[in-house]
Each structure stands twice: as structure tokens, then as C-alpha cells.
Amino acid sequence: MSQLNLIPFFCVIIVLSVEDFPLYTIPEKIGPWTPIDLIHLSCPNNLQSEDEGCGTSSVFSYVELKTGYLTHQKVSGFTCTGVVNEAVTYTNFVGYVTTTFKRKHFKPTALACRDAYHWKISGDPRYEESLHTPYPDNSWLRTVTTTKESLVIISPSIVEMDVYSRTLHSPMFPTGTCSRFYPSSPSCATNHDYTLWLPDDPNLSLACDIFVTSTGKKSMNGSRMCGFTDERGYYRTIKGACKLTLCGKPGLRLFDGTWISFPRPEVTTRCLPNQLVNIHNNRIDEVEHLIVEDLIRKREECLDTLETVLMSKSISFRRLSHFRKLVPGYGKAYTILNGSLMETNVHYLKVDNWSEILPSKGCLKINNQCVAHYKGVFFNGIIKGPDGHILIPEMQSSLLKQHMDLLKAAVFPLKHPLIEPGSLFNKDGDADEFVDVHMPDVHKLVSDVDLGLPDWSLYALIGATIIAFFILICLIRICCKKGGRRNSPTNRPDLPIGLSTTPQPKSKVISSWESYKGTSNV
């Protein structure tokens, strides 16, 4: 708004007259030419002039749309997804505990989602704690399942509100719209069965924050209001206006597509369904200074050209291009015929692509037909070159259009994961992938030996086990000794030297080494 106040006669043209700054303007049709003198040349006026017979009178207040207004008003909100964290443990015979973590979904409530959102934006540690998996419980030779419910908040989640129907629009809604948003149902269902969308402001009643109060001066003809001059000095006519309500606020849609509201308007005609308000989007705010600079430069070029023409008392085809009206609307077109300067009143239309007026070589298309030239000369500096091509001076100076194209290409909107058209969700209730990036990682764990006993009992058990182990070793050793004695042969008493046992009749027994020696000497 501040820039509009600084440069009222240039920026208002763009904001209020056209949706985007046009690439070029071309007359809707060419009327009869009238010869003029050089002193009749004038730089185009892109502002509407006041109606004849109407004069400025009293100051009054009116309501208009804010700068940056969008037909789809942005509504900031968040999504809330219900997730059940499960910890399943199994303890085997020797005490090894296997823990497996799982995630499933549940349907949340709007009240619980609002509380979780407040925790998150306020930095309450309870929100982060609620996302962690539960501490698993276990029991010997049993499977134990421990569950914990969490609410995953993803923000921001921006939806759009249509200012005409007051409905919310977003690809994340099942039908693309959420039309039953009231205080009694302060949430919208999404294309994910376990996710709700809620606005940041719990008191949102679809009231539009798109209006601003301004001060202007009425232009009256007796008791009839012809129009008014707004606070930026731009005159607006009431001719062709119709009644249109935006966000429940009655007002008027003016002929140029702008919207205003003031008490007791005299207009009674209602707008048709296709008569909507011009879009004034953020892109225009971003390039506003570029547009203003370009318009100022073109205005200065036109004034410099006019000064040069009047000083030199001569004009060329190229210089006529500076006197073309830059935006759609009524103006004048100029040409040179038989050495005389000519003008005609025309209505300019915007051109967004050169192919609209140059469909083929040598053809300048106006009113769906190729217009004739006079010795290679058309109007407004447009000529036909020696090779048959149409030469338009502005085709070489489309810097402003390049600025807008660059800005359009540099927009990277933040997308909510549910907006992705190719998103597929699990039908069995298991948690979907988009919640994983907003929750701590989970994995399968195998614990050390754990019998589920307290520390002192565990130490007592370990001590008893060690004692029992030593006792067992002692018992094994004793048993081994007793078994070895039973299996060993009986020891005989030693005999005196020189005596031998009585020989057995069937075998010769040598009882000692001495006896063996004596026997061997015989």
C-alpha cells in the first residue's frame, strides 16, 4: 500500500486494471484515420477520466480489498494423525527378551488434536514425549504388548478459502473441498482416514481478512453518484457496476473488476455468476517495484520523445511506438500516411503471446483478420520489413515480461505430504510412511538375560547359582573317586624272597625275578 501511495498514477494501473502486466496491447479494430499536427500528440493516459458533469464533493469512507488479496484466501492450519505405538516383547526360557516395535493408526478427535498442537507450538516437552515408543514390559515365557497413543502434528498445512462460497479447498480433502466447517464441527476430514485438518485459529468462523477501510472523495452530479476518487488519486466510475457479496459483506463489482463497499449504493443490478473480482495476487506485490520502474521509464521515454518531436518538428515510425497505450482500455493509435500524421480512437486489448497477433509471416492479426498496410506501414511504429516479416519495436524490449516469468518460475510452494496426488495409504491400519519422518526411529531389540527380577534378587540368584555350581562339582568329584575304587584289582601280599608259589599243573608260573633267573640257569 505504501508503494501505491508513492506512485499512484502508475502502480494502480497494474493492480486495478489487469490481472498481469500485458506483454503488448493491440487495438481491437482500426477506425477511420484523422490528420493531426505534431502539437496534438500526447502521451497516453492510463487513468480513467472523470465523467462529464460530475464534480468532486464530500469526503466519504469505503471498504476495499487489501493489497495481496486472493480469490482463494490462504488459511493456515495443521494436520493431526493418530498413531498407536506398540511394543511387543517375548521372553524365552533362558531369559532373552525380544522386543518388536510396531505402529498403527487410530482416528483422533479434534479436541485432542488441538491440545497436542498447543503443546507443539509452545515447546511443551509432553509433545515430544508422546511421540516416543512406550517402555516395553515383559514376563517370563510370555508375549507382552504395550501400547501408547500419539498424535502427529504436521504444520503448516495451508488450504484456500473461496471468498464467494466461503468453502475450503485443498487436494488433501476427499472431494477437494470442505464445506461443512462450522464451530460445531471444527475440523475437516482428509483423504487419509486417520488424519484431520484443523485451522491454527480455533475461533475461525470463515471470516475473511481481506478488507481495508479507505477514504475518498465522491464525484456527484446532483444527487446521483458518478464515481469517486480513491485515496491514491485514482478515479473510479460507478458505470457498469453490479452488486456482489464477498465473504458475507455486500459491495459493488466495478466495471474494471475491482470491488468496493460503501453505505447505500445506488446500484441495484446483481452480478452474473461469471462476473468475478479481479485477482490481485502476491506475485504482483513482488514485482510491483519492477512494474513501477518500467512504467516510469516508459513514461519518461514518451515525454522525452514528445519533447524531441516538438523541438525537431519531425517524427519517425519508431518514435510512434512510445505513444501506444500500455494497458487495455480506450486510447489513441497513430500512423503516418502520405507524409501526414494520423490518429484514431481505439480500444486496446492485451496480448499475452506474440503468436496471437502474428500468426504467420507478413500477417498482423486484428479482429480475426490480417490488416492491410500502406507502403509497409501499419501504426504505432509497426512496419513490414524487406523480408516480409512484421517488425514491432516492443518485441525487442520485453524486460518486464521477463521479470514476471522469472518470478513465476522461482515459486516453490511447500507441499503437505497428503496433497501428493499419487499418495497410497495402507488399508490394514498399519502406520503410513509419511508419519515416520515426524517420529523417532523404531527397531527390533534383543536384550541380555533378563528374568524379570529386581536387582537384589538377581544378585542373590547369581550367588546361589555359583554356590550350587561348586557343590555340584564337589559331588561329581566324590562320585568319580568312589567309582574308580570299585573298578581297580585287589592287591596281593608280598611273598618272602626265595619262596615261590606252588606251580599249577597246567601252566608254569614265575613268581619273581630271582626264580626266573634260577630257572633259566638250569
From Swiss-Prot:
Lineage: Viruses, Riboviria, Orthornavirae, Negarnaviricota, Haploviricotina
Processing and modification events after translation: Glycosylated and palmitoylated by host. Glycosylation is crucial for glycoprotein export at the cell surface.
Intervals, Virion surface compartment: 26-455
Highest taxon above the source species: Viruses
Intravirion face of the membrane: 477-522
This protein's name: Glycoprotein
Gene label: G
Pfam families listed in its UniProt record: PH_Rhabdo_glycop, Rhabdo_glycop_CD, Rhabdo_glycop_FD
Subcellular location: Virion membrane
